[in-house]
Structure formats: C-alpha cells, structure tokens
Amino acid sequence: MKGTGGVVVGTQNPVRDYNHSTDEEYQRLRRLADEAYKKRDQLSHESQTAYQQGDKKLAHELSEKSKAQLKTAEDFNMQAAEYVFVENNADSSSNEIDLHGLYVKEALFILQKRIKFAIDHNEPQLNVIVGKGLHSQNGIAKLKPSIEEFCAKHGIRNHLEKGNSGVLVLELQGVQMQMDGPAVNAPTNQYNAQPHPQYNNNGGQPQGQAQNYNNSGNDNKDSTLTSIFKIFCNCIQSLA
C-alpha cells in the first residue's frame, strides 16, 4: 500500500521512495511561506517609510499587516513540517526517525523530544535519517552537522551508519539529557530574517538579523511541533 507521498507501507521491507524535493504539496506550502515572508518584508519597509514621513497611523496599519503576513508564513512552514514529517516517517521502524525536509530548528526541536522518548524507554540506539545534503544549497548538508553539534553538546556518541552516510546512529546508553529547560527552543518568528529567508534554496537556514515583532505565537509553535512528535510516537508504538 502506498501513502500519499509514494511511500510503500504495510510490508516487511518497505520501499523508501518518498522524495520531498519533488512533492508538490510540500513545495507548495514552503513556497507560500516564502511568498508571505516577502510580503511581510515589503509591508515592513512601507511601514518604516510611512513612520519616517510622519504618518504614524499608516505606519501602524502597515505594521499590523506585516505581522499578519509573518503569522501566515509561519503557519505555512508549520504545515509543511507536519506534512513532510508524517510522509517521511510513514515507513520508519521503531528505532529511527527521518528528518528529511525539515528546517534545522524544526528538526532539532523534534529530535530532542525523540531522544528523550528513547532514553525514557531504554532504547540503546536511535537512527537519525538526515540525508546527504543533495537538496541543500550548493549540495552542502545542514542537518547532519547541526545534529552532530547537538550531540557533542549533550555528550551523545554518534557515528555514520556503515555504508550509508545519510544516517547518523546515536548511541544512547548511559546518556542523561537535562530536559527541564528545552535544549532547543521551538521555532519562533525568529526563524525568518531580514531580508526574508530564501527557504526554497537554503534548506531553512535563514541568514541575517531577525526582526522580532512579538512572541505571541511561540506557544502555538511549540504545541504544533509537539503534536507532530506525538504522531510519530503513535506510529512507533503501533510497531512495538
């Protein structure tokens, strides 16, 4: 049986043929997010111009519209993250997690929760599918080095799966992660930047200085990514 993304599920040896880089729905959601960021930037620029010209009322109106576009962009990115995560993990075994198609902050946020789950359930290893960076800008992988850095920070030994440089094997025996405060914050409105991030081309590593409008959406984003993780937990528990 195939999932909507072309993943064969329900077999003993599932075939991995889902590719987010050619998935029209995934690309549509990321593209809509990118377009909303561009609108946000334009409205922000117009707001600043109006303010400098002394029209504070117009500046405020444009600023509010800019904030609305920011929320729209973030919503589309969260939809894309949920969509690609579910598609990629439809055929994942209970000791692996596929982070293809997630931006770095999305991936790290979900990964830290998955590691905590593994530790709590005495799982000795976790296979993290990160890919080889073939779809990243200039073919430079972003997920793998970011996850290796995360592991180094938390004392998690890791190595590449033999014969597969797109899979990091995390050794979790004896690992104790302090999770009282999040090791990785949920993606917030600071995942974007001024100028707007070219998400479709750089794998979700925005460059530049973030413009911080407000933090009112942080809890919603935390909740959304937690929900994505819970979907994954349900999948692996069904395999147990």
Curated annotation (Swiss-Prot):
Predominant cellular place of this UniProt entry's protein: cytoplasm
Localisation: Cytoplasm
Recorded coiled-coil stretches: none
Biological process terms in GO annotation: nuclear-transcribed mRNA catabolic process, non-stop decay
InterPro entries: DUF1771 (IPR013899), Smr_dom (IPR002625), Smr_dom_sf (IPR036063), Smr_domain_protein (IPR053020)
Assigned EC number: 3.1.-.-
The keyword Nuclease appears for this protein: yes
Region of interest called Disordered, as start-end residue ranges on this chain: 1-24, 181-219
Compositional bias segments (type: Low complexity): 194-215
Disruption phenotype: Impairs nonstop mRNA decay.
Annotated ranges, domain Smr: 97-173
GO MF annotation list: endonuclease activity
Further remarks about this protein from its record: Present with 2130 molecules/cell in log phase SD medium.
Primary role: Endonuclease involved in nonstop mRNA decay via the formation of mRNA cleavage fragments in the vicinity of stalled ribosomes.
Protein name as annotated: Endonuclease NBR9
Organism lineage string: Eukaryota, Fungi, Dikarya, Ascomycota, Saccharomycotina
The gene coding this protein: NBR9
